[in-house]
């Protein structure tokens, strides 16, 4: 399985603080049948800055570790880029790259809002040949209150990534239900762990397929994982037309 969003690099953000913590986290990833991992430390965040060269250096430290080599995992370079008006400048200055040098950029919103310039920025990124992947939109308060905001962005060409623990109910039943609405309305394209540590949001991809409440969604979840592989090889993601089915369906009492 491919995981396109996690925090495995040592002492660069709110992920592992030591090489031993990183090793334990990667062992846990292996136990979840994860084979390919994109390291996506926070960048342009108010507390963290990780330009792509720094990410490459820190990732090579993991790749060259003898214990990690034994795990046989494939590790790739990425960034979780906080949305700001500095993204295009960062691309031009070669501080930002797509996942594994692809056209795909993982972009995070603030937790409470979608900035007013988001549509224009996403349009400009797409004219430059990049495709924004919105990280965990189901946890954004503005989207929770109004799913039309996400529909507009997806309809405009963006993609989105749901966090596995959202579907498993770790952020509460409302977030779980919203995540399922996104799937039913073709507003999701990837599933990822957003792993930080073995105790705080570990890798949980295999657990999705052990949750019988998600059985009706196994096919979609498998396709989202396959999409992760397409990102690594910079191939086009085939997506279904987004709908507003979430406006008609009654979700009372679901799950």
UniProtKB/Swiss-Prot annotation:
Keywords: Capsule biogenesis/degradation, Exopolysaccharide synthesis, Hydrolase, Protein phosphatase
GO biological process: capsule polysaccharide biosynthetic process
Pfam families in UniProt: CpsB_CapC
Metabolic or biological pathway, per its Swiss-Prot or TrEMBL entry: Capsule biogenesis; capsule polysaccharide biosynthesis
GO function term, MF aspect, one: manganese ion binding
Domain of life per record: Bacteria
The protein's Enzyme Commission number: 3.1.3.48
Catalytic activity: O-phospho-L-tyrosyl-[protein] + H2O = L-tyrosyl-[protein] + phosphate
Function field: Required for the biosynthesis of type 1 capsular polysaccharide.
Family per record: Belongs to the metallo-dependent hydrolases superfamily. CpsB/CapC family.
Protein name: Putative tyrosine-protein phosphatase CapC
